[in-house]
Swiss-Prot record:
Region described as G5: 273-275
Region (Disordered): 1-20
Species of origin: Mesoplasma florum (strain ATCC 33453 / NBRC 100688 / NCTC 11704 / L1) (Acholeplasma florum)
Gene that produces this protein: infB
Binding residue positions for GTP: 136-143, 183-187, 237-240
Annotated HAMAP family: IF_2_B
Keywords: Cytoplasm, GTP-binding, Initiation factor, Nucleotide-binding, Protein biosynthesis
UniProt xrefs under PANTHER family: TR-TYPE G DOMAIN-CONTAINING PROTEIN, TRANSLATION INITIATION FACTOR IF-2-RELATED
Gene3D superfamilies: P-loop containing nucleotide triphosphate hydrolases, Translation factors, Translation initiation factor IF- 2, domain 3
Annotated stretches, region: G1: 136-143
Descriptive protein name: Translation initiation factor IF-2
Amino acid sequence: MAKNIKTNKKPQQVNKKEMSKQHAKQIKQQLNETVATGIIDGVFVYTEALSIADFANQIGKSVAEILKYFFAQGLMLNQNVVLSEEQMAELALEFGFDFRKEESLTKENFFEALDASEEDKPEDLEHRAPIVTIMGHVDHGKTTLLDSIKNTNVVGGEAGGITQAIGAYQVKNKDGKKITFIDTPGHEAFSEMRSRGANVTDIVILIVAADDGVMPQTEEAIDHAKLANVPIIVFINKCDKPGADPERVKAELMKYEIVAEEYGGDIPFVQGSAKQKIGLDQLEETILLIAEMQDYKANPNKLAKGVVIEAHLDKAKGPVASILVKEGTLDIRDMIIAGTTYGNIKHMEDETNKKVLKAGPSKPVVVYGLNEVPSAGDKFIVMNDEKMARTIAEAQAEKKLAAERQSNQIFSLDSIKKHIDDGELKAINLIVKADTQGSVEALKGSLTKIDIPGVKLNIIRASVGTITLSDVTLASTVTDGIVLIYGFNVRPDAVVRKKAEEEGIEIRLHNIIYKVIEELEDAAKGMLDPEYKEVVTGSAEIRATFKHSDIGTIGGFHITDGSIERKSKVRIIRNGIVIYTGELATLKHLKDDIKEAKINSEGGLTIKNFNDIKEGDIVEGYKEEEVKK
């Protein structure tokens, strides 16, 4: 069995230099260690997922026996299919073997393997400050709440208070208890870190304005908070304003399964005003109560590990990174690996611009000395061996590059049947956006009735509105199975389409509910009709309208993007909602018929069987091309 990496052997008796030396030595041993696999004393031992051919070889069975087993379950597989850990365990038991996974450390799986291998002794753990993230709709008071908390409680009571925008802050209440707040630009950044495996936060505060209620970004924040699977506190803000209605907010949140304790739920609610600093004490008490119940602990007496919160390149100081220590203690002059970067910590300071020499669990600091700028969400670990740090960082960079090259090679709708048969697909995750709440509810009701044997169908978001960057960001955080975004009478703009393509997220657009259901069911059965890719050729803004007695309403247009051809299919978009899809009847420049209108050109158009075109409408031209399989 591979040895666990221990960095906490009697830390009180081992100095930092000796601990670092031992740590580097143990990692070197593990990197060079070959773990014995196969059948050992009647136990199937493995380190990673295996193909059917490799698995059969390791347990001394024929490929035919393995394939026969799956065939009896209705799965037609081949010897190159890579088995999941659950399938290997199932097969091991079927053939009379127990099973055990051994961790094997490599330069490529360095951070993941360390996370899995290190376990602290209970007696080495000490309580740490809870780490809190505030999320909510724009203008509901997130920034004001953070500012009020920072200005009310400053660690150590330093004059001047918190001055640095480092992405995280630690405050101390009147009883001396500390809380760390993560200040991300939005829930997209929060989820981006989570998608990289960096589970940064312990608690999410959902802020909702009492005079505004649940808004679109509130819904998005709820989705992200639930996916993070951490306790949620609701802070109803602006209770001092005219029109404030906290009870309405509580009622609205019930639709999202956010139910207050007073109504039989398990979500604590706090009412107040961030601007007037009302309710802040109760909010902090609630955070600390949850922290006490959850019993957040870490071992401070080991080499530090943590997460990069944000980073940038300073022209004078070089790469600068804001990091959060999750466990252990970071010392100045430590060498760290942070994702694909490494370097000695030459200088370290906190949110008050004060130089610090050490940073323990839950402490955010700014560090200088890395060779390059790391990415938000990168994990870091102390590695006081420069040669090894450089080697591991380079391997991480190669791994990242390979992942980027394959980012578009994900499961597509057309390949669902094959991946189900191969046993590679366990979940289909859907984000559903529609033009009305009625459409949303109808789609949810129909989708939940779909039954695909062996595959779980999850609706991770269903809401009214156009397809946004937030939807694509949420989709990119999903790691289990495939994710599809469905638009019902709504569609993405050019920026969102491009982002989805970059992330390898498939967007499907429909205007008939049963077509969505049929498409998913047929995909599971491998019966999809030829797939047509929609290519948007251009967009035009209607800037004026004219009535004509013979041909109806003429839309005076300006081409804002690409071009629109006379033969193009078009859709009319009003306030982000598709209100009509059809064909052009006429396309003119002055009095002349034209075949195409290019970017920045102007003219007049009419739509077949549609006479309700209005100023401000967007006319989007598109064509359909069959996707070559």
